[in-house]
A protein has these predicted regions:
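Metal-cofactor-binding active-site regions of metalloenzymes
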Residues: 1-14
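Fold-independent oxyanion-binding glycine-rich loops
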Residues: 4-7, 32-33, 59-61, 97, ...
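His/Asp/Glu-enriched, well-ordered alpha-helical/loop segment
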Residues: 72-91, 154-155, 159-161, 166-239
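A structural connector/turn signal
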Residues: 148, 221-224, 267
């Protein structure tokens, strides 16, 4: 069992005493969609996690900076957390990295020996801020940030792709909730963008969406590969078939889909979980 616990108790931003008594089954801590703002608190949390072999998962956002510059807010907190990872040799996973500056910090930290991994999302690869103004956190970035994400995938800086799937209801979106659905479209978006448009080998995309996440989560002894003895978790796709996304046909409880009306290659035809078919698309 792999459980995640908040970095600070009840997300209060300062209390970390609970980390000292976490059971062995807890392998990750995260403040979810927030960054811990206090430097000393975060440093102490990193020190504890090194002792207990816990990975820190970080949404990087300096809340004092974000009201006037979202990009700088991500960059600054990414730099801080990477330095803490290097100093304490704490395993750090940077979630939904979206800026060139954050990637630069991660690359430099890795070169210095910091145990840092990172992920990017399909929507930060597909959209830039000239094409979509959609409330999501981190925000949709500039075209040069998107190009940097693609480069970081190709050079191995990026460890995996994560959907950051956020199925908010229409009512919650109307109230300003940040996020979008992206689970059902994730492979097609990434395959079309990375493989069809950017020339990424399909084998590398498969790694980023299977073995890569399994390694980050410490599940790679039984998930992420098609070999005897591993869990039979399989996705079958038609890489030659182009299809159009229709939000009203999604299975998610939410329809807040920014890809509505867009066409992609790589339609998912079947999913198998633990050897059992959990989804099968009807052929038209």
């Amino acid at each position: 069992m792999n459980q995640t616990v908040s970095i600070t108790e009840n997300f209060d931003g300062v209390s970390i005493d609970h980390l000292k008594t976490l059971p062995a089954g807890v392998k990750f801590i995260t403040e979810d969609g927030h960054g811990v703002q206090d430097n000393a608190t975060m440093a102490k949390a990193f020190a504890i996690c090194t002792q207990k072999d816990i990975t820190v998962m970080s949404h990087a956002e300096d809340m004092e900076i974000s009201p006037w510059d979202y990009r700088l807010a991500e960059d600054i907190e990414t730099v801080r957390n990477c330095w803490l990872s290097e100093y304490y040799q704490t395993k750090l996973h940077m979630c939904h990295v979206s800026t060139r500056g954050a990637l630069d910090a991660i690359q430099m930290a890795k070169l210095r020996g910091a145990p840092v991994t990172c992920e990017v999302t399909p929507h930060h690869l597909w959209f830039d801020d000239s094409r979509l103004q959609y409330k999501v956190n981190p925000p949709i970035r500039k075209a040069d940030d998107v190009a940097a994400l693609v480069t970081a995938i190709k050079d191995g800086t990026v460890s995996c792709i994560g959907t950051d799937h956020a199925p908010h209801s229409a009512e919650d979106k109307a109230k300003g909730a940040a996020g979008m659905v992206g689970l059902e479209t994730a492979f097609a978006v990434c395959y079309t963008k990375l493989c069809r448009m950017e020339g990424l080998p399909l084998e590398m995309l498969s790694f980023l969406m299977s073995s890569g996440p399994a390694q980050v989560l410490g599940l790679d002894e039984h998930k992420g590969r098609l070999v005897p003895g591993f869990d039979a978790d399989i996705v079958l796709v038609d890489t030659d078939h182009m299809f159009t996304v229709h939000a009203d046909e999604l299975h998610s409880k939410s329809k807040n889909c920014p890809y509505d009306g867009e066409s992609f290659y790589g339609q998912v035809m079947m999913t198998i979980k633990g050897g059992k078919v959990t989804y099968q698309k009807d052929r038209q």
